[in-house]
């Protein structure tokens, strides 16, 4: 994010965010003005079996604020997420968006077998298809 003029989206799970809290402190310190950090909070380490995380006790937006993020939002519905995404051009960056979501994943979810570019394309296709519903 520091060496790019492009907007950078960091997509994180709650379990990963909890394990790497130092990253939030670094982001808050450096303040990259093109970074949007999204934490999908399903209160589980879903990709490795669904064990519960300690995120019910965690408030990621408050953590991000205390680390120096100028903008934070927490959403629980698609309508709230749509509003935040619409407001995004007016937010100071870096921004953190915590998305509360239910546990549940694709039946074929496994360990990564494709590269980041292919993952991005599949995510964008699925997101686009879900938004059309």
Label the model's feature ranges:
Residues 1-122:
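Thiamine diphosphate
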């Amino acid at each position: 994010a520091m060496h790019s003029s492009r907007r950078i989206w960091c997509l994180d799970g709650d379990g990963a965010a909890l394990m790497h809290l130092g990253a939030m402190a670094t982001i808050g310190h450096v303040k990259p003005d093109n970074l949007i950090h999204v934490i999908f909070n399903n209160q589980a380490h879903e990709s490795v079996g669904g064990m519960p995380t300690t995120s019910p006790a965690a408030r990621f937006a408050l953590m991000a604020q205390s680390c120096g993020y100028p903008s934070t939002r927490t959403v629980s519905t698609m309508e709230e997420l749509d509003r935040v995404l619409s407001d995004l051009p007016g937010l100071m960056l870096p921004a953190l968006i915590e998305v509360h979501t239910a546990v549940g994943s694709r039946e074929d979810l496994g360990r990564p077998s494709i590269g980041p570019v292919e993952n991005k394309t599949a995510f964008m296709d699925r997101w686009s298809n879900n938004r059309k519903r």
